[in-house]
Amino acid sequence: LHGLGADGRDFVPIAQELDLSGVGPVRFVFPNAPEMPVTINGGYVMPAWYDILGADLTSREDERGLRASQAAIEALLEREKARGIPASRIVLAGFSQGCAVALMTGLRHAQGLAGIVGLSGYLPLAALTPAERHGANATTPVFLAHGRQDDVVPIMGAMASHAALQALGHAVEWHDYAMGHSVCEEEIGDLNQWLLRVLATD
């Protein structure tokens, strides 16, 4: 799931750098967020999974928008399962806003996923997560990664999300890198190794 103002094609170059041949055929799905006015950008209409109401991403959250995107990604997961892909072979991943939606949706999904990936983002509606998360994903592996110089989504928010997930008993692999709000080669390598582990069939 892509970030604010981007589209699904943003993830294509990253997917092309991953070598997952060791776990058999892998298919990537790159959905696009709807276009909507974004408050923090002066109401400018752009692709967004939800509205950003202010610089403090968690003090005022667009719960309606978040839940609408959760429903859209749930529908996408159901379509994939209807194609014959079991939930246990699906990894839900996102960057920035996409990270927030991936974490929110994955933790609440009613069937156990192979894993959840959150890059340069945070856990939204964190106070509601303990009551709303589904037991089916209580032990689902989570990969979180963030840039130490990120001035768009500060790393402190990601660290708080990491701590919250650990407190709930989730198996979280955490990485941070000397970069801003972006993705780096080392991160892709770490993600590759993690994906090989969570998708291993033996």
Task: Name the predicted role of every residue range.
Residues 143-146, 150:
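Short beta-strand/loop motif that positions the catalytic acidic residue
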Residues 1-91:
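Serine-hydrolase catalytic machinery in alpha/beta-hydrolase-like enzymes
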